[in-house]
Amino acid sequence: MSAVQEALPAVRSSRDATVRRFALTDAIFHATTRAAAILVLVLLGGVAISLFAGSWQALSTFGFSFLTSESWNPVTEKFGALAPIYGTVITSAIAILIAVPLGIGIAIFLTELCPRPLRRPIGMAVELLAGIPSIIYGIWGLFVLAPFLQTTVQPLIISMFHGIPGLNGLFAGPPYGIGLLTSAMILAIMILPFITSITKDVFDTVPSVLKESAYGIGCTTWEVTRRVVIPYTRIGIMGGVMLALGRALGETMAVTFVIGNAHRISTSLFAPATTISATIANEFTEAVGDLYTSSLVALGLILFVITFLILAIARYMLMRIDARTGA
């Protein structure tokens, strides 16, 4: 028997041991990643179940009227979620309307128009805005923005639209400074860095050959941005907007400072109002009685459902866009 034949069993044994070791490592890796994925679903389900269980007393007591009633009276234990829902939706919608054009515009400037020496400082300034705690925004809004709006902007707007049908009610009432519009402006400032950063990052993924080809046939910067950059990155932009909207819907401290915390619905954007998160933050520690606490938990469940529905609608919209464009 040759030396090679004598060494074959040892080689096979070493190879089999290596294969078994790799197989064990691979199995552990698969099990760990699978457990992590399942944990996410378990946590999500646990949050939903705990919110539903905690809100059951309020939901069973008030029924569907909990969603349609504006009343919120802890003394008589009559609770309705319509006013907080209204405030949450209106402030978030206005914030998105303000922040999306600004964020996309800043991203276009940074990627297409900004001189190279200024790109890094401006980009760092945008990222710094994202790192400021929300309570700082709230304090700034209460002591700086709200007084400025009260003494300067709101009286001017009220006088401009006074007597104009349809718009006079939208900007009616005394200039409190705080209210729906102030909260929406604070939210817009807070979510602006998210939209800008994500949009800038997805703009950077556009292949240079596409933009250079468009410039080569005589397209302007506006045409390149509109016809090449934005269509190529639409899904990433939508993702950034949805992330910002989720931040706006759930924001608590900054909104609590400047919204006025009034459980009422007004057509005026200058009127004090409240949101779901602000109501929970203001009243949870003062909730006396099981029904009061259950009503606050029910508000949390409603916010959970609203956020889930918005993300589901966004996903559906992206699927429709992909199907229509063949992406």
Curated annotation (Swiss-Prot):
Keywords: Cell inner membrane, Cell membrane, Membrane, Phosphate transport, Transmembrane, Transmembrane helix, Transport
Keyword Cell inner membrane: yes
One Gene Ontology term from the biological process aspect of the record: phosphate ion transport
Subcellular location as annotated: Cell inner membrane
TM helices/strands, residue ranges: 36-56, 89-109, 128-148, 178-198, 235-255, 294-314
One cellular-component annotation, GO: plasma membrane
Membrane topology recorded in Swiss-Prot or TrEMBL: Multi-pass membrane protein
ABC transmembrane type-1 domain span: 85-314
Major localization class: membrane
Recorded GO MF terms: phosphate transmembrane transporter activity
Entry keyword Membrane: yes
Purpose: Part of a binding-protein-dependent transport system for phosphate; probably responsible for the translocation of the substrate across the membrane.
Similarity comment text for this entry: Belongs to the binding-protein-dependent transport system permease family. CysTW subfamily.
UniProt xrefs under NCBIfam families: phosphate_pstC
Protein name: Phosphate transport system permease protein PstC
